[in-house]
Amino acid sequence: MDRVSNLPEEVRCHILSFLPTKHAALTSVLSKSWLNLWKFETNLDIDDSDFLHPEEGKAERDEIRQSFVEFVDGVLALQGDSPIEKFSLKCITGIHPDHVNRWICNVLQRGVSDLYLFTDFSDEDTEEDGGYRLPQEMFVSRTLVKLKLRSEHCVNWWHWDIGASLPNLKSLNIDSDLIFFGEMEKFLSSFPVLEEVHMANMEWRELDETMSSASLTKLSIHGTGVEEFEHPKSISIDTPNLLYLNYSDLVAEDYPLDDEGDVVLQFCNVVKLINGIQNIQTLYLTEDTLEVLTMCCESMPVFNNLKTLGLKSDEGRGWQAVPALLRNCPHLEFLIIEGLLHSVTDKCGDACDCISREDKGRSLISCPVKKLEVRGFRGTIREKEMIRHFLEYFPCLDEMEIDAEENDSTNFEVPRILKVVAYRLHDVVSTEIVGHWQSSAQSGGWSQTQMDEMYYELAPRNKERIYDMFFFMRRASSTVPPPPPQEMSQDYLQMQLEVADLKERQRDQEAKLADLKERLRAMLDMIVDQNPIIASALRAREATNSEREKASSGQEMTEKERDYDALFDIIVEQNPMLASAVRALRATDSERAETSSNQEMTELGQATATYFPPREGE
């Protein structure tokens, strides 16, 4: 007998609750002790894709759909009147709405608390105008605590012509093709203890909406974002206990609010929206919202309760609103920036280091942020300068966490770039560590215990602007970690600085050489196109080069090669532009060869220094 079968029935029922109902029912063939066990499940998860998968086109066959209906009916019949906690139904294969409503009513009568419905009906499936309607029993349930509704089309989620009362509902999530809501105040009043609301693809029926709820703490509204649909001219939000707001839609003309508590909304444009959320504790702003907030930099409210601020940026949007935000967050502790690169303008503000200013870093100096997380770091020069800027002007910064962009071509030598930043920034650097937080266990990596111990040893201290920096690199890496902190001398840091500078200069030089060569090639192509004789000479040279490759390296130049070189020299002398281009191109190739040779010698010297240390007395 296997060990699982010897477990108590309560434990085995709990294990089955994590499986789809169809898979749980299949365990009845294992033994007699499993025969009826699945019938006592309090969590039912029924998914028609599990039942009809994997044969393509199977869902179109009437007998298969009928067998699915019989399966669900059989499961519910076997359980009888036993209590049920959670019922999840995914049904998008053309099942008639009457069957779906019968199943919903069954679990409602048995006291279901969590109900998740993912349904989709065609026009042929629904006989009523306005699409599928949920059973009336669902709107008067006294046991529902969580309700999640999702559909693609032809579903009318709410009955406006009947009364509704769900006294224990705390979480409501509706994601539909279109949600036509009107009389929002009446809608929310049906849920006296509602705490979380999420609505996606929402279209407003009324031009003036009021959302009032004393219990609501989390509100997410995602409109259609299509101008052709109706959008409210005014949204009034009366939610004194609201802690989280996610609003994504075209901006309404007005956002009045009647509440006199913690949140006060009194605005007639976008400025009012930001004023109305000034008492929140966590705020995340997308790149679009960040750009819109440039309109209210001068009237930015003070966020006295804000602890966490997240900003998403891209290269096409500016940072005009960032300085005002940072100056008006007197208790900010955690700052998240997703994407350091942004559009550089003269109104960019002093939060970045893009333009030299006399009042550089003023908004950062007044910001008390303790932890900074940078996401999507690519290792570019601009990003490196931004990191330097933050380290220099955030006075209370204790911890910086950098998430490097995976597999980005510009993300090179990120650990050494951070070494350069920290070393150049401060006159005194006691210890600076760059750690690799590996996404998977790899040879040579640090364990979690080692990371925790090292972090404990390197407690940041800022009183005398002496920093112990600890950077987390959230990326897979096979790089051998740096030595322990007690072995990291100033000489080691200086060596890492020099190596990083050398590699950075080499990359800049290679980029300049590549650009110069591309321009010279373009110039030569233009000259060749305008001079047929030169084109013939170049073709002859290509043929000669091909013959040279076939010949041995010690063979002397043939008479044909000497004649060609003489002809080419004559053509070059007659065309000064071509002569200059050829000389520059040859100089470029020579310089590249010299650089490559110097690099090889440097690497050889490092290798010999590692494996053959100097003897005593040398």
UniProtKB/Swiss-Prot annotation:
Renumbered residue ranges of the record's region Disordered: 587-618
UniProt LRR repeat ranges: 147-176, 196-223, 224-249, 282-313, 314-339, 354-379
Family annotation (Gene3D superfamilies): Ribonuclease Inhibitor
Domain of life: Eukaryota
Chain intervals with Polar residues compositional bias: 595-609
InterPro entries named among the record's database cross-references: F-box-like_dom_sf, F-box_AtFBL13-like, F-box_dom, FBD, FBL60-like, LRR_dom_sf, LRR_FXL15/At3g58940/PEG3-like
Residue stretches making up the F-box domain: 1-47
Keyword Metal-binding appears in the UniProt entry: no
SUPFAM superfamilies: F-box domain, RNI-like
Annotated SMART domains: FBD (SM00579)
Keywords: Leucine-rich repeat, Repeat
Name of the protein in its database record: F-box/LRR-repeat protein At3g58940
